[in-house]
């Protein structure tokens, strides 16, 4: 089990695939997602990483949280969340996670706070059919109807589907597919809709009802590792370029030496022929 990520919902758009099909996607952005703290079994009784996303003003952050972020040597964060991980998948404090944490085709579970609808009736809240439009029904066309029984039990059971507050609740949508990622801009594009409004925070985890892919990055796709790989690649490219340049210079020097030797040989041959003519 590895860490999930915190992302901001940017909005929805569509992508055109190579076969011409268009896929509706939700764009999620990773905004300076860093590890703020660790939870270990020895100290806390469980293994987890605490992540922080976004940047908050210091004056809008409590003194306790300012101290918490200062201990991790990170900027104050707007959103903080914990993710349970296996002990071997703990991430060092201060590390930044990139959008390459997920790959195209992978299935994920996305959790967020749904858009609040206020007080809603049973037809909107629970998809009830409502009462008859006529034939004796007046005023109560969108009513949910009877809610109880007779004198026994003489009450409304808990959990009865009735009118009430709708939305603004924690919702998880499972088995959503990642269509595309953009590590440079920190974007993850997921097929379909995810809970929440534009600008809201969501959490993304590996799908629990799908097998874990073999090619996932453990413990996470870290910016430091990507920068190190990029640096090594640049050094290897520079070394290869220098080696090619040295080989080219050596070949040019060898060709120049061969040309000079051929010129000297030609001059010597001309001198020899001239001497033979004088004799």
Swiss-Prot record:
Protein name per its UniProtKB record: Large ribosomal subunit protein uL3
Assembly with partners or alone: Part of the 50S ribosomal subunit. Forms a cluster with proteins L14 and L19.
Key words, A-Z: Methylation, Ribonucleoprotein, Ribosomal protein, RNA-binding, rRNA-binding
Domain of life: Bacteria
Function of the protein: One of the primary rRNA binding proteins, it binds directly near the 3'-end of the 23S rRNA, where it nucleates assembly of the 50S subunit.
UniProt xrefs under InterPro entries: Ribosomal_uL3 (IPR000597), Ribosomal_uL3_bac/org-type (IPR019927), Transl_B-barrel_sf (IPR009000)
Family from the record: Belongs to the universal ribosomal protein uL3 family.
Taxonomy of the source species: Bacteria, Pseudomonadati, Pseudomonadota, Alphaproteobacteria, Rhodobacterales
Gene: rplC
A GO biological-process term: translation
KW Zinc (keyword) present: no
Modifications made to the protein after synthesis: Methylated by PrmB.
Residues where N5-methylglutamine is found: 151
Organism: Dinoroseobacter shibae (strain DSM 16493 / NCIMB 14021 / DFL 12)
UniProt keyword Cell inner membrane present: no
SUPFAM superfamilies hit by this protein: Translation proteins (SSF50447)
GO molecular function terms attached to this record: rRNA binding; structural constituent of ribosome
GO cellular component: cytosolic large ribosomal subunit
